């Protein structure tokens, strides 16, 4: 099941910090990522539509993956961030990273999700400027 796009939180700095600070549910973080990747839930057929999803994602994940619970999915997300966008978490949010003692798979996945969302936002802005 999916939250309607109109009810997803906006991709603002506040939302991104909520993700980093573990103030948004994993399900909401996943659904933000799914929406940005192009996955759409059809409540009438109760199926996921992936016609807007890039082929490299659709091939591996015909249905949206659980990014917060799946290492392979989050690794693919990490690898899909263009090199020019790898530091957006630091550059745009001033995120200093975690100390070694604070590192957990959950926090790392949330930081990856935020960096990918920042990359998505930057890519959309670049496409709109052309």
Name each model feature, range by range.
Residues 58-130:
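Low-complexity intrinsically disordered segments
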Residues 2-57:
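Calponin-homology-like cytoskeleton-binding modules
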């Amino acid at each position: 099941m999916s939250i309607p796009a109109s009810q997803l939180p906006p991709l603002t700095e506040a939302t991104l910090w909520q993700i980093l600070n573990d103030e948004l549910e994993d399900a909401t973080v996943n659904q933000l990522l799914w929406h940005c990747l192009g996955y759409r839930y059809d409540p009438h057929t109760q199926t996921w539509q992936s016609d807007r999803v890039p082929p490299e994602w659709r091939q591996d994940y015909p249905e949206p993956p659980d990014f917060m619970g799946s290492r392979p999915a989050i690794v693919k997300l990490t690898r899909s961030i263009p090199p020019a966008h790898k530091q957006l978490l630091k550059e745009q949010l001033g995120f200093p990273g975690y100390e070694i003692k604070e590192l957990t798979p959950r926090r790392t996945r949330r930081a990856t999700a935020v960096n990918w969302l920042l990359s998505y936002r930057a890519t959309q802005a670049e496409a709109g400027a052309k």
